Amino acid sequence: MDNLNDAQKQAIVHKDGPMMVLAGPGSGKTTVITKRTKYLVEKHGVNPRNILVITFTKAAAREMKERFEQLMKGECQVTFGTFHSVFFYILKQAYHFTAANIIREETKKAYIKESIDRLNLEVEDEADFISNIIGEISLVKSEMLPIEHYYSTNCAEEIFIQIYKEYDQRLRRNQLIDFDDMLVYCYELLSQRSDILAMWQNYYQYILIDEFQDINK
């Protein structure tokens, strides 16, 4: 660790309890996370299976895993993933979901179009309208906003509520989930089932999150 500054070393050798590392772009955050993970395994004797490293994109997770394996000179059993991949893994264990349960983008658009046609909506650009509505549905879900208190910028309030409810009903009827459902379902599962929460807390005893400041809740 000779090439690291004092703040980086402090973050790496920290063992138990929460720690937030604030640093700008290019300051070595990925280096700190990978070397801290290595330090937990080699110096503190932590089982690699009990370490979870989360980042926002698949590419970032893959890069971090590769850099860590270079440090360890081989594969290791630390879990690297995105929020969505980790939460979907938890849901798979609880509800036996598979990739077939994840809605495809074209199916999502088709569901919204069904509502447009059923409600006889006249829109100037249907493709843009569908895309915008999908974005608003995602916002409502990911922020866990009460649908009755959300005001759409694309259509009347009662129309948006109707489209939202029909979309959600079609998902459930066809046993499908979207990416925002992964977050919400996992949150609800761990909030309502203390036994399942305790199981995952025991399994992932050390959780390292890259770009933690970008999370919403």
Please place each PLM-identified region on the residue numbering:
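Residues at helix-coil transition
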Residues: E42, K92, D117, R172, ...
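Residue-level signature of catalytic and energy-coupling elements of molecular machines
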Residues: Q8, T57, T82, I112, ...
